[in-house]
Amino acid sequence: MKAFWRNAALLAVSLLPFSSANALALQAKQYGDFDRYVLALSWQTGFCQSQHDRNRNERDECRLQTETTNKADFLTVHGLWPGLPKSVAARGVDERRWMRFGCATRPIPNLPEARASRMCSSPETGLSLETAAKLSEVMPGAGGRSCLERYEYAKHGACFGFDPDAYFGTMVRLNQEIKESEAGKFLADNYGKTVSRRDFDAAFAKSWGKENVKAVKLTCQGNPAYLTEIQISIKADAINAPLSANSFLPQPHPGNCGKTFVIDKAGY
């Protein structure tokens, strides 16, 4: 099923002229009074290792994972999460509840809850085949039996009325910018090695300035710790522009990776 979904999308791209689907402006049609997005990127080998270590059912994207020539390609898209809108906060909703329930938060937006245990039960996103093909290259859990893109849109996109192509196209673009940055090169160059948080921060600072290191939250699992996710806080009013030193906002916590961690490689 996964292969069919991807192959159909790739065929569609070959039959269509190139368009700027992934360059459509991302604009909230409602609840647009928030100040930031969190770009969540998985270190895919670490994510799969964490699922294995916790005896979770192996996802197709982990079972089929293979080595790649460009190790930066293991930096994949998890999601793009709008911050808490002021209009929702005014109804008594705090950050913790917003991040847990997203668009299903009560009393508003109060959409049907998207559950991680039943991601394929979430509605189809309405993505164009062209954008779906591009997304499948950077979000291994999209389509197939994982349906990550359905879950992410239902939880973090639907209540804002985001155009699905703009929403996921923005993720594709930002993922590419991070992979091509000094931080992306650092991850690729240190594949399978133990690194320091200080050196990672220095790589990020080379691209976007020392003051923006606080925009990054790193998540690790295991002992010794290995990287599973990178979350980057981006100003809402900068989301449609290429990343620059003026794009970021600080996060309240740097994450749990500690002073050193492993850039995990493929395999268990």
Curated annotation (Swiss-Prot):
Keyword Disulfide bond applies: yes
Signal peptide positions on this chain: 1-23
Catalytic residues (positions): 78, 152, 156
Localization: Periplasm; Cytoplasm
Swiss-Prot/TrEMBL GO biological process terms: RNA catabolic process
Cellular component, GO annotation: cytoplasm; outer membrane-bounded periplasmic space
Post-translational modification: Contains four disulfide bonds.
Record EC number: 4.6.1.21
InterPro entries: RNase_T2-like, RNase_T2-like_sf, RNase_T2_His_AS_1, RNase_T2_His_AS_2, RNase_T2_prok
Catalytic activity: RNA containing adenosine-cytidine + H2O = an [RNA fragment]-3'-cytidine-3'-phosphate + a 5'-a hydroxy-adenosine -3'-[RNA fragment]
Superkingdom: Bacteria
Enzyme class, UniProt record, top EC level: lyase
Listed Gene3D superfamilies: Ribonuclease T2-like
Recorded GO MF terms: Enterobacter ribonuclease activity; ribonuclease T2 activity; RNA binding
The entry's keywords: Cytoplasm, Disulfide bond, Endonuclease, Hydrolase, Lyase, Nuclease, Periplasm, Signal
Main location: periplasm
Pfam families linked: Ribonuclease_T2
Disulfide bridge partners, by residue number: 103-159
Subunit comment: Monomer.
Its biological purpose: One of the few RNases that cleaves the phosphodiester bond between any two nucleotide. Shows a preference for cytidylic or guanylic acid.
Protein family (similarity comment): Belongs to the RNase T2 family.
Protein name, per record: Ribonuclease I
